[in-house]
Every structure is written in C-alpha cells, then in structure tokens.
Curated annotation (Swiss-Prot):
Keywords: Protein transport, Transport
CDD domains: PH (cd00821)
Any one annotated GO CC term: cytosol
Regions of compositional bias (Polar residues) in chain numbering: 1-12, 55-74, 167-182, 193-219, 914-931, 953-969
Function: May play a role in protein transport.
Domain SEC7: 1-84
Originating species: Schizosaccharomyces pombe (strain 972 / ATCC 24843) (Fission yeast)
Low complexity biased stretches: 27-37, 105-121, 134-149, 257-268, 283-301
GO biological process: exocytosis; intracellular protein transport; regulation of ARF protein signal transduction
Positions of region (Disordered): 1-77, 103-149, 165-220, 249-301, 904-969
GO MF annotation terms: guanyl-nucleotide exchange factor activity; lipid binding
Protein name per its UniProtKB record: Protein transport protein sec73
Length: 1082
C-alpha cells in the first residue's frame, strides 16, 4: 500500500474520499512478503521525514505551500517517488493522485484531501482507506506515520501481465478472458465522499459493502489496529484464487450501487474475496475451456494453421493457387482422385452390415459401400482378423493408383480420404494392405514387400513423434536415418522422407470440409484462412508432382553397344584379320645374329644388326577427342596415328610418318585386292601345283613397312588388358561413327572412325585382343608368320623324333588353352552375377530418388547430388557388366572354334600317311570348318549366353557369313593420294621373291625376322629381342653324346616346363622372348 502527502490547495478544493477496504479472508502471500512490506514502509518513512525536516528548516515547507513533493526536482533526483514510470510495471495504491497520473491510466485509489500542520508532516486525523490485493492477514505497523510516508508496490503481481497471458494461481480453476477495460486497477467504493466534513463521520460506519464487510472511516492512529484485527479465513483447496475471473468493472453513473458495470473507467475495479461472497450476489461464472483431446496421428485444422503460420515452401505454389476464396472442396471437385467419394461424409448412412458366411470379399465390399462412407470403410474392414475382411481390405486398396508417386505423398493421399482405426492391431492391418498395394504399383523400388512395410510404419511413427505436443524429445534427422537403416536404401532417401513428413502434418478430408462449413457461419474470418497453402496436397490433387522432381533420366538399355562379334562366323573373320598383321621392323644394334650363322666369316661386330618384327593388327589416322578444361561441353578433335598391336594401343602425333605408312598400306591393298585364300584363285593366277606348295609358301605375304625404325616412341600408350570398346548412342557432343575405349586404369579415349564399317572393325579387334590378353591366351598367328624350322643340320634319323616332340607340345598347349578358357568362363559368370546384384540395388535407389518430390530447397539439392552419384556408379557397373558379357561371349565362341579345329585336325591325322615329317604335317583347313558351323551354332544357342548386342543392331564385319574366308582385307578409305601414282604394278613372280632379290622389297621378308608379341613392357627393351635367331628358345651348345654326339635342350628353364601359361605381365623382357619363341611353333 502506498501513501502520498497532498498539497494545501488540494486539501481546500477536494473533499475527503473513501475507499473500500476489502480484507481478504485467506492467506495467499507468504511471510516473506509481510516482512519485506514492513521494512519497505519503515525505510520510506524515514526518508520522507528527513526530507521534510530539511524543507521545514529552510522555511520552504509551510501549511499554505502549494508545492507537490512528487513533482519536486529533489524528490525525483533522489528516486523518492516516480509514479508515472513505475505505473508501467506495477500498480500503486495511494490516497490521491494528480491529473497527470490519471491520464497515464494508472490503477490507483482516489486522493484524500487533508491539511498539513506546521508541527508535524502528517495530519492527526487522516482517513486512509486502502484497497489491496493481499490475500493474507496484514502485518501490524509500527506507527501511523509509516503508513502515510511510504508507497507500497505490488511486487511480482499478476496485474503486470496482459489479460491473455494471465494464469490462475490455482491450477484447478480455469481462467476466463476479459475485455481490456476490465483489467488494470481496483474498484471505487460505492457512494460519494463527504466534501464538507474534513473529519470522518460516523454515518459511513453503517455502510455495508457488497462482499459483506463494513466500510469504516477511521483515524490514522487506529488504521493499523483495524488492519491487524481483520479476520483470517483459510482458503478452500479448490475454489479460492485471486485471478482475473473475479475482477468486475463498476458503473460510473451509479456510484451508490455496488453492482459492477463494464462501462467503468480504468482504475476503478473491485477485487472480491472468492470464498466469502454471499449467496444473494451473482458470482461470475468462469468460462470452461475446451479440454485438449487425446493426441492423434492427424491433428485438427487449427493446429495445422498454427504450424504453417511461418513456414514457406520452395515454390510458394503461385502457379497452383487460384483466387483467395479457394478451398479444398473446389480442388476435390476438379480432381479425379476423389471421384469415388461424396463431399462431407460425416455420418454413417445406416448401421454397418454384418458379415455372414455366404459373403465374399466382393459382395461384402459392395454392401459396405452402400451404407458406410468411404472414409469409414477402412476402419470397418480392419476391425477383425478375418479372411474375408482381409481380402475385402486389399480389394478396397486396389482401387488406389500409386504408380510413379512418392511414398509419402501416397500416404498423405490415403489418409486424406480415409480414417485410421484406433487400435494398434487394426492399424497394422491397414499399413500392411497399404504397403502391399504400393509394392504392386511400384515393383522396382523395393526388394520385397516387407521392406516397404517397414518404411511405411517408420513414416507413421515419425509423424506421431514430431506432431505430438506431449512429446518433449523430438526425433532428429540423424536419429531417424540411423534407426531406419533399411538394407540397400541410400541415406539420402531417408533424409528426404524426414524433411517431407515433418514439413506439414497429415490432413483428413472430413475435418477440412467441416472446418470450411463452420467458418462460413462465423462472423469473423481469419486472414490466414484466405489461402489454404496445403502444399503437398495441392501437388497431389492437381497432379503437379513433376514440378518438384529432379529432371534426370537413368536408363541404359540399348545405350552402350559393342558391335562386331555376334556369332562364330564373325569371330572367325576377326581372328583371321588379327592373325595376319602388318609388320614394322625395328633395328637392334646390340645383336648381330648373322655373326653366328654358318655362312658368316669375320668378326661378329662387322655383321649386320638384327631386326625385330613389331606386329600391327590395325592402323589408321583417326580424330582423337581432346577435352579442354575451359570450354565446358565442347570437345576438340585432333588427328593422330593409332596403332593397334597384340597387347597395346599406341598414339602418334607425327602425321608425316603416318601418311607414309598409310600410303604403303594402300599400295599393298591395291596390289593384292584380287587375291583370296581359296585354292582356285591361287591356281588361276599362278598355275602352280598347290599340293606341293600349300604349306611351303604363304598365299599372301605380310605387309612389311619400310624402312626399319631405329627409334620407336609413341606419344601415348595404353595396355589392352581388361580394356573395353563400345559405342554410345545417346552421347552428346560427339561425331558420327565415334567409339570410346575404357582402359583398366579408368581412363577413356574417344576416337572417330571415317566409316561405320571401320568403326565396327576397330571395336571388334580391340575387344577380341582385350579378351585374350585378360585371360592370358596366345594371339592367333597364321602359319605363314612362323619361322620355318631348318632340319638340314640334323641327321635324318632325328627328324621323326623331333616331329613327335613337336606334335606332343602342340597337343599339350591345346589342352592347357582349353583349361584356361574354361576357368576364365567360370570366373566371368560368377562376376556377372555379383555385379548384376549391385546394379539392381543402384537401380532401386535411382528409381526412389527420381520419384521423390522434395518440398524444401535443401532437400532438392540433396536429391540431385545423390542422383549424380548413383548415376556415375550405375554407369560404371553397367559398362563393367557389358565388358564381362562381351569377354564371356568371345571366350565361348573361341572354345567352340577350338573344338571344331581339333576335330578337323584329328580327321586329317587319320588320313595322314605314316611318314611324320614336318612337310607332311597339315593344319586343318578353314574351309572345312564351315561344314560344322551349323552344329556349333546350334550347340552354343542352347546355352544361356548374355545378350550383348541390341536385337535391332545389324552391325557385322564386312564379309559373307556363309564363307568368312572370302574377304580377307577391309580397304581403308582414309589414306593420302600422294603416293598412289608412284607405286607401280609388279609381276606376279615378284610377289613371292622368285626373281626380285632386292633387300628392300616389301614382299620379301627378312630371313632373320622374328615374330614377337607386344606385352606391357616390351617397348622399354625391344632391341634386346633381336638376338634371338630361330623359333626355338635358344640353341644350346651341343655336348658329346654316347650315340650321336649331339643333344638339344628344348626348354630354357624349369619354370616354362612346369607352367608354360604363367601370367604374361610377370615376365621380364628377356624371359618374354624365350616364352614366345618356345610356344610359337605349333
């Protein structure tokens, strides 16, 4: 309680006023507040007395003074009294207030006019009625001066809070709201004050207040006693409370009445004591607030509006929203998704039909549709675990279309049309039926129906966890990802589901339509209801899911093809082309093989250096793609000379030397363009007995490029081990007839062929060489390329023994080759199965990610990044599978072809004469294989061979499949015309070197030439191979023998004897030449 000393003018013009003293009958404040009130009043009294004594001594304080202490500078400086500033935070109860305080709307009591004597700062007779909110007994004050000299502030009073934030001190009583005019201050006492009598009259003692107490006028000396003598009543445990429910306004017009009026001014409210109100007085009834319903999975629409108040969408849905009067009902009328339901299905049309023994799932569902709304059908069908009800539930779910829709959107659509049952087992049946239907509509998104069920159940639990207000600990995104660690699903998919589910709660159509109908009857409209803003449902109802989906297509069917080898006939053609390569001669200065021949006389250093043959399976000048870092999306092409060897692919930038090689190749092809491998054409051109010369001379000599090279250093070189060449049909920014080669280190090279036939030949040869090199098999070499064994230095009785040894070696190598092919085929089949499983997992993740429709920008970025990663992994796996399928197909054709050759060879051996001289050993004719081609193809078709090429693809090598030997060379168009006029036709006899003895003749190969194969490291030490002079490993020193005095060592080391098919890359260059020389003579 607070007191203020009025001025003398106020005492003369204003009358004495009374205020009611509402003594609380229950103690609601603690003893701490009582003690603090006494201490506060005593200190204020001492300060005022000290200040007034100073003013009195200076003569400025008299009885006629009109100075207001509250406005004096000294009082403000010493923080004695700040009524305006403190009224903003708490309420004061004073005797009187100035006009400026009343304009500030301070809830204070009326001023009391009294005179101040010169002898004392306080009058002897003062009426100080006090209006307080104390609910306990007031403490006894020490002196009346302490009451007049201080001003009590209601610390931590509930009046400091606005009406909307006030809470009852008793949690068992519901507080009601009141208008702003009802809040703020205490009520005036009834009846006007006596303005003539300065002393309080005894007539006011008989005035009865509304709450049953008397309005008393006492002197200041008796005020403390009266307050201390107030009765103390215990507060009832439930009903008593000091709250805003018991603050009532007082009518200003009728001051004699104690009936509250809502038209009272601010600062005139009365505080009642709730336990002591008489029965004849109407007690305000508190408004009962609606109790919060039980937490459910689908909240009310009001909750949705509060949750969506400050939430923004990624697209703001400007293109999807219509006018301000849009509602869900309008969208439903224009949507085909709700054609099976009626608007506002709020009540059952009749009772639920009973399930009889004669009812089937279809009949019971039809009866249920006639009596029960669609939204209530799902709880009825899931009520019991019955076979017919379960079938009817799945039949009801079958009417929903979930194709190519995200799982979270389908779940929202289902719950928008249907209600969930209350029990857990019933909810489980509904989720099971929903997951089964979604799995049927999207078969490639999940590995099983159980996986889909687990994900749907997790989304339902996540929604309940997030939007349940009673749950204090919400699940975080990382916790959801860790808990829902479903096998084979990417974590980005779980992150997407978390963001979309927590974006907005689920909505049911019945609740939405009822809310719309209710708001039509309301007198006010919420501004937030002008636009619904249900972003996921707007997407679903208007079928606009493609707006938020990432535009990335992951389809590889028919995209990568590797043409050229589709049957045994095409494989045979590629094999013949590779077995007759061109030759580049390299000069080896470290070896002088002629010095060790029988015809050389002189020092070894004076002998001519040796020459090493470097086989070239294919060559050409091809534009090579060079990617630039600065220019994105634009690739430049530069011409390079490309050489394809038996183990590597080489790139040269020296186009001058490249044009020289291409000119020699063109002249060679023009010279022998009319030659074939058939004996009839050979007989016509030569007129020679081919029976005697069939295996003595080559039918077509190899192409030997001149002059020999002293240096051979390519600009770029790649190993063909585990390489793969393919054509990308959908690749952008590439030229026509282009193909790509992927090497084992992951690097790629894109080349452009001049024609489509040339492109097919390049792809077929690269894949064939890569298959053999990866499996560790020898490259096929024509018999004309094998150096001929000279038996003139051996005795005649040793010829049969050497021929028998050679035949046994050939048979052993054929067995080892067949065993190696079979082992490699088994490895490829196992690898293809494993890689297919990994590819299926990536395809499921890619389909899930491409179906997602994120609602937030951050989620969309995550989905795009995840799609790019999955795309890169899937493309790499797909190319790896295509490469293994290509190798598997080549090896199977190779195995079948070897069986045909072995069978033909055995037939030739049976017809062979008893003499086993090397001149009578025959190799199987290629033409004889054509008789068994039909049987081999039939046998290979029975096997489950992976389909490598596109069915519509007719790519094949140039030639007749019926007679693959009819075409031996494929002419190259890309060749310079500068050298064509200088080449002259030579006679036929010069082809085989009968008359021409010049050493530079391309048709006369060197007698010291050695056929070698290029391995990974052959370019590092190529010249060392020139020391080998024969087809055997090496000639050992002849030692004395008891019989003949000669001995021949056919094996150079024990390693070759035990394992002649050791991995080639592990050999050094010295052992490489030995291995090839020992195994090349078949």
């Amino acid at each position: 309680m607070t007191f203020r000393i009025p001025s003398s003018q106020e005492s003369s013009n204003k009358s004495e006023k009374d205020t009611t003293v509402n003594s609380p009958n229950a103690s609601s404040f603690s003893s701490f507040f009582k003690k603090s009130s006494q201490t506060y009043l005593s200190k204020r009294s001492e300060k005022l007395n000290e200040h007034n004594s100073k003013l009195k001594s200076s003569g400025s304080f008299t009885s006629n003074s009109q100075t207001d202490l509250s406005n004096s500078p000294s009082s403000k400086k010493k923080n004695i009294f700040y009524p305006i500033a403190r009224a903003k935070h708490s309420f004061y109860f004073n005797h009187n207030w100035s006009s400026d305080l009343q304009q500030a709307n301070s809830p204070v009591a009326s001023y009391s006019s009294q005179s101040v004597s010169n002898d004392s700062n306080f009058p002897k007779d003062v009426t100080s009625p006090i209006s307080t909110d104390l609910s306990g007994s007031n403490p006894s004050l020490k002196s009346p001066s302490s009451i007049n000299s201080a001003k009590l502030r209601a610390s931590r009073s509930f009046f400091r809070f606005p009406k909307w934030s006030r809470k009852s001190w008793n949690p068992d009583v519901n507080s009601t709201t009141s208008s702003p005019s009802e809040v703020g201050s205490l009520d005036k006492a009834g009846g006007p004050l006596n303005q003539q009598n300065e002393n309080l009259s005894a007539e006011s003692d008989n005035t009865i207040l509304q709450n049953g107490t008397r309005k008393s006028s006492v002197k200041m000396s008796d005020l403390g006693k009266r307050i201390a003598s107030l009765p103390v009543v215990k507060r009832p445990p439930i009903q008593f409370s000091i709250s805003s429910d018991y603050i009532k306004p007082v009518d200003k017009s009728d001051q004699t009445s104690n009936v509250p009026s809502p038209s009272s001014s601010v600062g005139s409210l009365r505080l009642y004591r709730s336990p002591s109100i008489p029965n004849d007085v109407e007690q305000p009834q508190p408004q009962s607030s609606r109790s919060r319903p039980r937490s459910s999975t689908i909240p009310t629409q009001r909750t949705l509006e509060r949750l969506r108040e400050n939430r923004s969408s990624i697209f703001s849905f400007r293109t999807l929203r219509r006018d301000d009067d849009e509602c869900v009902a309008q969208t439903i009328e224009n949507s085909a998704l709700f054609s099976d339901i009626k608007p506002n299905p709020t009540k059952f049309l009749s009772s639920v039909p009973e399930l009889t023994a004669d009812d089937t799932a279809e009949s019971y569902l039809s009866k249920l549709r006639e009596t029960v709304p669609y939204s209530r059908m799902i709880p009825v069908l899931a009520e019991k675990d019955h076979v017919t009800l379960n079938k009817a539930l799945h039949l009801c779910m079958s009417g929903m279309e979930f194709e190519n829709r995200p799982l979270d959107f389908c779940l929202r659509l289902f719950l928008l049309k249907s209600h969930l049952p209350k029990e857990t087992q019933q909810i489980d049946r509904v989720i099971n039926a929903f997951s089964k239907r979604y799995f049927e509509c999207n078969p490639g998104m999940f590995s099983s129906q159980d996986q889909c069920y687990i994900l749907v159940f997790s989304l339902m639990m996540l929604h309940t966890d997030v939007f349940n207000s009673n749950n204090k600990h919400k699940m975080t995104k990382q916790e959801f990802i860790n808990l829902c660690d479903i096998d084979e699903l990417a974590p980005e998919i779980m992150e997407y589901y978390y963001d979309n589910i927590t974006f907005t709660p689920f909505v049911n159509l019945d609740d939405e339509l009822l809310l719309i109908e209710k708001e039509k009857n309301e007198k006010y409209n919420f501004t937030s209801r002008k636009r619904l803003g249900l972003s996921p449902y707007t997407f679903t109802l208007e079928n606009q899911l493609n707006i938020s989906r990432p535009e990335i297509s992951l389809s590889y069917d028919g995209k990568f093809i590797s043409p050229g080898i589709k049957d045994i006939a095409s494989l045979l053609n590629v094999r013949k082309l590779i077995s007759s390569p061109a030759i580049i001669q390299l000069v080896s200065k470290r070896s002088h093989p002629m010095a060790f021949s029988n015809h050389f006389i002189g020092l070894p250093d004076n002998a001519d250096p040796g020459l090493v043959d470097f086989s070239i399976s294919m060559l050409g000048i091809l534009p090579r793609c060079e990617k630039k870092r600065r220019s994105v999306g634009h690739n430049s092409y530069k011409e390079h000379l490309v050489l394809l060897t038996a183990s590597r692919i080489l790139f040269f930038r020296n186009l001058v030397w490249a044009k020289d090689l291409m000119a020699q190749k063109k002249a060679y092809e023009r010279r022998y363009k009319n030659f074939t491998t058939t004996s009839s054409s050979f007989d016509t051109l030569q007129g020679i007995d081919t029976e005697a010369m069939e295996y003595e001379f080559p039918k077509i000599p190899p192409l030997v490029f001149t002059p020999p090279l002293e240096e051979f250093s390519p600009d770029t070189s790649y190993s063909l081990v585990n390489a793969f060449a393919y054509c990308d049909r959908d690749k952008k920014n590439v030229r026509n007839c282009s193909f790509t080669v992927i090497f084992r280190d992951g690097s790629e090279e894109t080349l452009c062929a001049p024609t489509e036939e040339s492109m097919i030949e390049w792809v077929a040869k690269i894949n064939y060489i890569s298959t053999l090199r990866t499996a560790g098999l020898r490259m096929p070499v024509s018999d004309s390329y094998h150096p001929k064994r000279d038996f003139s230095c051996y005795p005649k009785y040793m010829e049969e023994e050497l021929a028998a040894i050679e035949a046994q070696m050939k048979q052993d190598m054929e067995i080892a080759r067949a065993r190696t092919i079979k082992t490699r085929i088994d490895q490829l089949e196992t690898s293809i199965t494993e890689f297919n499983k990994k590819l299926m997992v990536l395809q499921r993740n890619a389909k899930n990610l491409s179906t997602c429709a994120p609602l937030q920008p951050k989620t969309r970025v995550v989905i795009l990044q995840a799609l790019k990663k999955v795309d890169a992994k899937a493309q790499s796996l797909y190319l790896e599978i295509r490469k293994m399928e290509s190798q598997l197909q080549v090896l199977r054709f190779e195995s079948d072809l070897d069986k045909c050759i072995s069978l033909e060879s055995s037939n030739d051996i049976d017809d062979r004469p008893s003499s086993t001289s090397p001149s009578t050993l025959k190799n199987p004719s290629i033409n004889s294989i054509n008789r068994q081609t039909h049987d081999v193809e039939k046998e290979s078709s029975d096997r489950d061979v992976p389909h490598l090429l596109d069915p519509d693809n007719n790519f094949n090598l140039k030639g007749n499949p019926e007679n693959p030997s009819s075409t031996f060379f494929t002419p190259e168009i890309l060749s310079p015309k500068v050298y064509s006029d200088n080449v002259k036709d030579e006679p036929v006899e010069d082809i085989f070197g009968f008359e021409d003895t010049s050493e530079s003749s391309p048709g006369k190969p060197s007698q010291l030439r050695l056929q070698i194969e290029a391995f990974d490291d052959e370019l590092a030490d190529t010249a060392s191979l020139g020391s080998v002079t024969t087809c055997l490993d090496q000639w050992q020193t002849f030692s004395d023998d008891t019989d003949s005095g000669f001995a021949l060592n056919l094996y150079s080391s024990e390693d070759f004897r035990t394992d002649p098919y050791k991995e080639h890359d592990e050999f050094s260059m010295n052992s490489l030449s030995k291995w090839h020389s020992a195994t090349s003579d078949n």
